[in-house]
Structure formats: structure tokens, C-alpha cells
């Protein structure tokens, strides 16, 4: 893939140039930044990017992950054997609903192989979760121990990479944890699981304040993007940052905001090396991550 990056560099224009520049920023960050965040949204895990992300974590390109509940849902469902099939953006959604199928973009997922698979996985672990107070990164590690190394959570657990999920209740895993606590009231007289998100914040505070230089690859937007740049401001901002997104900035959304906007908030340093790649992540992330593996 490094040959592709070099080709993009020679093309020297438009988003090809931005991809080549993003590679250079991330390559330097691997050698200079001791804290390297990887932020991505859950929809990417519904694609084959899941295995590429897992490889990047096995290679320890990054040592902190911030993601969404959907990433856990798709990662677990796939590990449990759920079928994710290629489809079309133009499929009839009413017909899909009648057939018991979900559509995520142009990926089709069986309704019975999504939520139920995730719920079964979580509920099978209720016994060892009851009565404990866990941060989301600790829950992710607990789940990762039981998942294969080609999964994101499995790779992260084996590599010692913390996975933070600030919006963990916003998905099948969160609902399954609620069901887990409902079962605890019936079977154990109230020995519930407590998900302590402030414990996550304490850990992030230690990571950020303990780091010398901060880097981030941020794919997509939303809570996973903002949580990284929010914490970076308490260290003076990110030193290296690459955004990959197709969102626009002109509606004032966080998802479309460029790195330069984060400078005004103190979340990216004025001296930071930054690149914004306006592209579908499924097109450019494999190139960047594969080129970086082994560096």
C-alpha cells in the first residue's frame, strides 16, 4: 500500500494529495506521539474495515480507542456468526422490513442475527458482571477476552489497548446490560452491574496528562470524535491529527468541523500537523492503515 501512497503523492492534487499527507502525519506520529488515539464510528464495523482496524490494534499503531456503542454491537454480532451481506443503497426498505432484514447503507443484516446475538453474548456473561462497578473500557476488555483476535475487542484486549465507549447505552450492548440488571433483581436480589462512565473519564484524564505528545486519527464524527478532542484540550491540544469524513462544515456540525476550527477551542494546537481527508473511509482507511502497519 505504500506504493499507492507514493502514487497519490505524485498525483499531487485533490484528495489523493490529502491521503498522502495524512500518511506522512500518521507516520511521524507513530515515532513522536506516545498517546495515539483512534476514533471511529460504529457503522464502519459493519464493513470489512473491522478486520483491518483489528490488525492496526494488533500492530499497536494506536494505544487508545474511542468509539460508539454500534462498534461493539457489530463487532460482537460478527464474532457470533452474524451474516453481513452486500446489498444496495436503493433496496426497498419496506420489503426488507417484511423479510426481517436491516439495511445499513448498502450492507444487509438479518434482524435475528443482530440484536439477539449481541444480547445472548452479553447475558451469558451476567454472572461474572453482577455486583461489579466497571468503566466502559473494562467492559470492553471483559468482552474482548472471549472474542477472537480478528475482532476489534479481541485484538484490543490482547494488545492492552483501552477501548472507551462514552455512549455505551446507545445500542444493543447497552440494552443487554439493562436486561442483565433486570435479571439480577430477580435472581440475585439486586446485585447489579454498575457502568461507571466517570471512571472512564478518570482514566482518560490520566492518559492525556501523562502523555508528552498527543496524536489522533479520527474517522467520522459524533461522540467518538468529540470525546477525543475534548480531552486533548486539557493538554493544550493535539499535536498530530487526521480527520477522515464526508461531512460538511457549513451547517456548524461537529462532524463536519475541520481541524482548524478545533484550534479556536484549544483542542488542536496551532502548531499541530493536521490533515482533513474528505473521502469515504472504506476507500482510504485500508490504504492508510495497511501502509502504516510494520512502520
Swiss-Prot record:
Q: Which GO terms describe its cellular component?
A: cytoplasm
Cofactor(s) needed by this chain: NAD(+)
User: What reaction does this catalyse?
Assistant: [eIF5A protein]-L-lysine + spermidine = [eIF5A protein]-deoxyhypusine + propane-1,3-diamine
Per the record's keyword annotation, is Transferase included, yes or no?
A: yes
InterPro entries the record matches: Deoxyhypus_synthase_arc, Deoxyhypusine_synthase, Deoxyhypusine_synthase_sf, DHS-like_NAD/FAD-binding_dom
State whether keyword NAD applies.
Answer: yes
Question: Which EC class, in a word?
Answer: transferase
Which keywords does UniProt give here?
Hypusine biosynthesis, NAD, Transferase
Pathway per the UniProt entry: Protein modification; eIF5A hypusination
Q: Which residues form the active site?
A: 267
What Enzyme Commission number(s) appear in the record?
A: 2.5.1.46
The molecular function GO annotations come to: deoxyhypusine synthase activity
> What function does this protein fulfil?
Catalyzes the NAD-dependent oxidative cleavage of spermidine and the subsequent transfer of the butylamine moiety of spermidine to the epsilon-amino group of a specific lysine residue of the eIF-5A precursor protein to form the intermediate deoxyhypusine residue.
The family database entries (NCBIfam families) matched by this protein are listed as: PRK01221.1
User: What family, per the record?
Assistant: Belongs to the deoxyhypusine synthase family.
The UniProt entry, under PANTHER family, shows:
DEOXYHYPUSINE SYNTHASE (PTHR11703:SF0)
Its name, as the record gives it, is Probable deoxyhypusine synthase
Q: Which organism is it from?
A: Pyrobaculum calidifontis (strain DSM 21063 / JCM 11548 / VA1)
Gene, per the UniProt record = dys
Amino acid at each position: 500500500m505504500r506504493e499507492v501512497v507514493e502514487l497519490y503523492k505524485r498525483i499531487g492534487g485533490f484528495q489523493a494529495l490529502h491521503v498522502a499527507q495524512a500518511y506522512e502525519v500518521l507516520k511521524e506520529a507513530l515515532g513522536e506521539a506516545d498517546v495515539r488515539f483512534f476514533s471511529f464510528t460504529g457503522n464502519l464495523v459493519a464493513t470489512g474495515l473491522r478486520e483491518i482496524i483489528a490488525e492496526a490494534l494488533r500492530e499497536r499503531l494506536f494505544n487508545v480507542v474511542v468509539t460508539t456503542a454500534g462498534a461493539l454491537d457489530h463487532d460482537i454480532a460478527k464474532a457470533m456468526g452474524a451474516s453481513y451481506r452486500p446489498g444496495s443503497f436503493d433496496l426497498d426498505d419496506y420489503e426488507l422490513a417484511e423479510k426481517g432484514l436491516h439495511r445499513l447503507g448498502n450492507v444487509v443484516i438479518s434482524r435475528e442475527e443482530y440484536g439477539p446475538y449481541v444480547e445472548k453474548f452479553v447475558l451469558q456473561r451476567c454472572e461474572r458482571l453482577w455486583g461489579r462497578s466497571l468503566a466502559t473500557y473494562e467492559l470492553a476488555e471483559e468482552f474482548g477476552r472471549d472474542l477472537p483476535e480478528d475482532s476489534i475487542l479481541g485484538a484490543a484486549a490482547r494488545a492492552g489497548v483501552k477501548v472507551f465507549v462514552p455512549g455505551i447505552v446507545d445500542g444493543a450492548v447497552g440494552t443487554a446490560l439493562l436486561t442483565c440488571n433486570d435479571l439480577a433483581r430477580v435472581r440475585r436480589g439486586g446485585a447489579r452491574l454498575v457502568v461507571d462512565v466517570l471512571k472512564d473519564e478518570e482514566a482518560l484524564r490520566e492518559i492525556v496528562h501523562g502523555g508528552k505528545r498527543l496524536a489522533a486519527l479520527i474517522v467520522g464524527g459524533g461522540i467518538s470524535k468529540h470525546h477525543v478532542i475534548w480531552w486533548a484540550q486539557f493538554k493544550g491540544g493535539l499535536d498530530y491529527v487526521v480527520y477522515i469524513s464526508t461531512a460538511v462544515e457549513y451547517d456548524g456540525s461537529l462532524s463536519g468541523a475541520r481541524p482548524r476550527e478545533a484550534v479556536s477551542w484549544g483542542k488542536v494546537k496551532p502548531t499541530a500537523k493536521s490533515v482533513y481527508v474528505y473521502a469515504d473511509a472504506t476507500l482510504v482507511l485500508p490504504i492508510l492503515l495497511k501502509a502504516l502497519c510494520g512502520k
